[in-house]
From Swiss-Prot:
Its cofactor is heme b. InterPro entries: Cyt_b/b6_C (IPR005798), Cyt_b/b6_C_sf (IPR036150), Cyt_b/b6_N (IPR005797), Cytb/b6-like_sf (IPR027387), Cytochrome_b (IPR030689), Cytochrome_b_C_euk/bac (IPR048260), Cytochrome_b_N_euk/bac (IPR048259), Di-haem_cyt_TM (IPR016174). Keywords: Electron transport, Heme, Iron, Membrane, Metal-binding, Mitochondrion, Mitochondrion inner membrane, Respiratory chain, Transmembrane, Transmembrane helix, Transport, Ubiquinone. Component of the ubiquinol-cytochrome c reductase complex (complex III or cytochrome b-c1 complex) that is part of the mitochondrial respiratory chain. The b-c1 complex mediates electron transfer from ubiquinol to cytochrome c. Contributes to the generation of a proton gradient across the mitochondrial membrane that is then used for ATP synthesis. It is a multi-pass membrane protein. GO terms for molecular function: metal ion binding; ubiquinol-cytochrome-c reductase activity. This is Cytochrome b. GO terms for biological process: mitochondrial electron transport, ubiquinol to cytochrome c. Heme b b566 binds at H97, H196. Heme 1 (or BL or b562) is low-potential and absorbs at about 562 nm, and heme 2 (or BH or b566) is high-potential and absorbs at about 566 nm.
């Protein structure tokens, strides 16, 4: 008799995705982040659901409802800080996952890669709207500044901004619709994740060598389930250390002040995981130019498969490309630091130099180095 997990229509899907899935025998811990992202998404949906039971999306009561969750709801503070710091863990895993994809050439699976970038945009939109909900100073002013960027779009810009605001400024209508979208988007993200996995399982996983591994595959369970559980334990230790010891380390102190449209904070800045893009936005003096640079800085990921010139897929055996990759990593970290600094000398010029370097590495240097490595290998 056939095992039920192989014959039952529903169990069969789970079996082919998580148990009997053929996986390359040599994938490293860099392949753990996919499962960690799935766990982060489930954690965010669960904690968010319980927070939504106590939160009110009204400008008069939003800030107080968050205070009420932290003070009066049983373990409400755990829910709130798990949700806030869970978002940070989500983005750490997300950026490492994308970095892995770039380093090992996983972007050559174009459908999986493109769905992944759409997922990135969706998660960024969700996180931005979530940051507005506590209705603190940085929530209000962050929402005002970022939504106002759309006014740079010629002709329809201002109409578009007022349409998103639901009035002539960020107010009750804005908060209500942001809460509605913040609640809805994670479920859309879950559906996109299914599509992401569907395309991935069409081709199978890449591996550190970048060479097809069809001749050497092992079942996902128990080998990689155990490996993923180890990754989960490490992530949960870091997350719980954050939540229980320094829950406000990654937040902004200004957000503990209720939103006040008459008082602007000295430095308006988004959460740390958007700072690199914010630094690129600020480094261009022109408003429309800045908005375009901001969008292109992330949308450029769509073009990475077409900028691949090397005959080798992975960077494992390409030391020159490795140097460029780590230069790009340090450049993004520099941009993250600059995004959190005030707009004054020398931060302006450092931000501009780092922004130019960011685009130069991806568009010009990486394809050139790929061609150069081909020549050096006499290919």
């Amino acid at each position: 008799m056939t095992n039920i997990r192989k014959s039952h229509p529903l169990m069969k899907i789970i079996n082919n995705s998580l148990i009997d899935l053929p996986a390359p025998s040599n994938i490293s811990s860099w392949w753990n982040f996919g499962s960690l992202l799935g766990i982060c998404l489930m954690l965010q949906i669960l904690t968010g659901l319980f927070l939504a039971m106590h939160y009110t999306s009204d400008t008069m009561t939003a800030f107080n409802s968050v205070t009420h969750i932290c003070r009066d709801v049983n373990y409400g503070w755990v829910l709130r800080y798990l949700h806030a710091n869970g978002a940070s863990m989500f983005f750490i895993c997300l950026y490492l996952h994308i970095g892995r994809g770039i380093y090992y050439g996983s972007y050559m699976y174009k459908e999986t890669w493109n769905i992944g970038i759409i997922l990135l945009f969706s998660i960024m939109a969700t996180a931005f709207m979530g940051y507005v909900l506590p209705w603190g100073q940085m929530s209000f002013w962050g929402a005002t500044v970022i939504t106002n960027l759309l006014s740079a779009i010629p002709y329809i810009g201002m109409d578009l901004v007022e349409w998103i605001w639901g009035g002539f400024s960020v107010d009750k209508a804005t908060l209500t619709r942001f809460f509605a979208f913040h609640f809805l988007l994670p479920f859309i993200i879950s559906a996109l994740v299914m599509v992401h996995l569907l395309f991935l399982h069409e081709t199978g996983s890449n591996n550190p060598t970048g060479i097809p591994s069809n001749t050497d595959m092992i079942p996902f369970h128990p080998y990689y389930t155990i490996k993923d559980i180890l990754g989960l334990m490490v992530m949960m230790m870091i997350l719980l250390a954050l939540v229980l010891f320094t829950p406000d380390m990654l937040g902004d102190p200004d957000n503990y002040m209720p939103a006040n449209p008459l008082n602007t904070p000295p430095h308006i800045k988004p959460e740390w995981y958007f700072l690199f893009a914010y630094a690129i936005l600020r480094s261009i003096p022109n408003k429309l130019g800045g908005v375009l640079a901001l969008v292109i800085s992330i949308a450029i990921l769509f073009f990475i498969p077409f900028l691949h010139t090397s005959k080798q897929r992975s960077m494992t055996f390409r030391p020159l490309s490795q140097c460029l990759f780590w230069l790009l990593t340090t450049d993004i970290l520099t941009l993250t630091w600059i995004g959190g600094q005030p707009v004054e000398h020398p931060y302006i010029i450092i931000g501009q130099a780092a922004s130019i370097l960011y685009f130069s590495i991806i568009i010009i240097l990486m394809p050139l180095i790929g061609l150069m490595e081909n020549r050096l290998m006499k290919w």
